[in-house]
Regions:
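Glycine-enriched, solvent-exposed interface loops adjoining structured elements
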Residues: 1-239
Length: 239
């Protein structure tokens, strides 16, 4: 089976798997909906493996105005989940430091006027707030802030739209959508259910080790770009 499949190819494969090739009990429009819902499941399964970055949008840059503390999240492609936030050390330098999030209960803890030292020490923090990203304290004007994020899944709206199964993982979409078809028919889905569970185990095992040469480690939450020179998080902004 090809790694990349179109919506039409997925629909044909689902009909074959559910043994409804010549049946219109489930229309193409309904089956397209099932396929998209199953694709959503696969997408979430992959991005839940944070750090493997299967779906990462181009970096999004915010330039602050010195007035507002909240800025709209990216809309093209639409924002889904945040991977990280960086603060530029100057308007001309490509040097950045990592900004840490704050808990809502700590919304006033960092509210003293923002500053940066030569080494980029800062008390700036962020928080996702609805469809905006909220910074505290109000950042100074003309600061560059980069957002690394996962976009929302693009639904399959035409028969020529494709899904990249990466390593045959489109089989998950086919299996799950076929289950939905058979559930509507009130047919036994136990075989497909068992197959789906095996697919989940396989995807979880293989998706996690994308960089087999340098596998991911447990993150050091005590480390901070804000602390100089040790990075231990013990200086201003470290927590």
């Amino acid at each position: 089976m090809a790694t990349t499949l179109t919506r039409l190819e997925l629909r044909d494969a689902v009909r074959q798997r559910a043994d409804i090739v010549n049946s219109q009990f489930i229309t193409d429009a309904e089956l397209n909906s099932y396929i998209n819902q199953s694709y959503f499941e696969l997408y979430d399964l992959l991005i839940s493996k944070y750090g493997d970055n299967y779906y990462v949008a181009p970096v999004y840059t915010i330039t602050t105005d010195g007035i507002n503390d909240q800025y709209a999240l990216p809309s093209s492609p639409a924002f889904y989940k945040l991977l990280g936030v960086d603060l530029g050390l100057s308007n001309t330098s490509d040097s950045f430091v990592t900004i840490r999030p704050f808990e809502f209960i700590d919304r006033n803890r960092y509210a003293v006027p923002n500053f940066q030292s030569f080494y980029g020490l800062t008390n700036l923090r962020y928080r996702i707030n609805g469809d905006k990203i909220w910074f505290t304290p109000i950042p100074a004007a003309n600061q560059r802030i980069r957002l690394w994020y996962i976009p929302r899944m693009t639904t399959l709206s035409a028969d020529g739209d494709t899904v990249d199964g990466i390593s045959g993982w489109t089989e998950y979409i086919i299996c799950d959508a076929a289950m939905k078809c058979m559930q509507k028919e009130e047919s036994d889905v136990s075989v497909l259910m068992a197959e789906k569970q095996m697919l989940i185990k396989r995807i979880e095992a293989m998706a996690e080790s994308r960089d087999v040469g340098s596998p991911a480690r447990v993150s050091d939450n005590m480390y901070s770009d804000f602390s100089f020179p040790s990075g231990s998080g013990g200086n201003f902004g470290g927590g």
